[in-house]
Amino acid sequence: MKKWTIDAAHSEIGFSVKHMMISKVKGSFTSFDATVEANEEDLNGALIDFKIDVASINTNNTDRDNHLRSADFFDAETYPEITFNANEITKKGDEYELTGDLTIKGITRPATFEVEYGGKGTNPWGVEVVAFSAEGKVNRKDFGLTWNQALETGGVMVGEDIKISLELEANPA
């Protein structure tokens, strides 16, 4: 197994959630770190852990971002990090299934991500690069993110399911 560190300049952790039951709000976290331990051919047996700085949330709307940082949602002052610690990764056809423990607001729940291994290459400066994409879905209420507003149409302002996406490039540690 080889250790890799995330190249933050070429990586992104994003999310999307239904808004008013008719559209989606997308955002990302601009400050995060991840470590990967993997063999060089594929992700079999890999360990992938990541840590996100909650205060770095960015939906391109300052008022919304501040609300998301508040105690109504992530309570970034009390719970400054979101973490994921891998338990297992298994090959499923051409992709992988990554399972582990996701902690948001001090609440830890199992989470599963579908992972696509992009492969390995060498950049123009001679540095090895591996890349992969991952997608998962969690129910925000499972992590104490319960704020919402009822709509006159009978729906709610914020959907329960949050789709999480990772686009990661890593270099040897």
Predicted regions and their residues:
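Low-complexity, acidic/polar, glycine-enriched regions of mature
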Residues: 1-173
